[in-house]
Amino acid sequence: MNILIAIIILLVYTIVIIKIEGSIPPSLSASVFNIPTNKRWIWTVILFAVCFLCVPTYIEKTSENTQFLAFLAISGLAFVGAAPLVKFSDDEMQFTVHKVGAIVCAACSQILLVFNCPWLLLLWIPFIIYGFIKDFKAWRTIVFWGEMVCFTSTFVYCLI
């Protein structure tokens, strides 16, 4: 049930952001930087809710040897959520914390699947095929769709 609530929360946020921006953003996680500074807390609440709703199931379903990857993936997502609220003297540093958290989250979640449910990595096939058709370099929303594959594969893993 917690996973379904997390999916709904993230889905609603994604739909709202697409409506606000008028198109699919280059990255869901970077869309927070298009939100007015005084409202970025919404992003933090959403991602923390997703983290806290997913963590029990995610860690419980994962083999003991790879539970640290689930923890790192959730921690990375929490960093992505918290980065907009951290006051740095330099906006670039804030974005760097955001990017590192996103990379840790994505990498750990997918490495976890390699060891626990490798068939879910097949979800990357349509992404890769479309990328070659569309040309990865010219594909403005490549990160967005990569994030969607990571979230989808992780949510499906938690649901099965």
Where are the model-predicted features located?
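Juxtamembrane "helix-exit" motif on the non-cytosolic side of transmembrane helices
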Residues: 57-62, 82-90, 115, 131-138, ...
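Hydrophobic alpha-helical segments of membrane proteins, primarily the transmembrane helices
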Residues: 4, 64-74, 148
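Juxtamembrane loop-transmembrane helix junctions in multi-pass integral membrane proteins
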Residues: 31-33, 64, 89-97, 135-142
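Alpha-helical transmembrane segments of polytopic membrane proteins
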Residues: 35-49, 98-106, 120-124, 142-151
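Membrane-proximal helix-loop-helix units in multi-pass membrane proteins
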Residues: 67-124
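N-terminal topogenic module of multi-pass integral membrane proteins
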Residues: 1-63
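Terminal transmembrane helical module of multi-pass membrane proteins
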Residues: 116-160
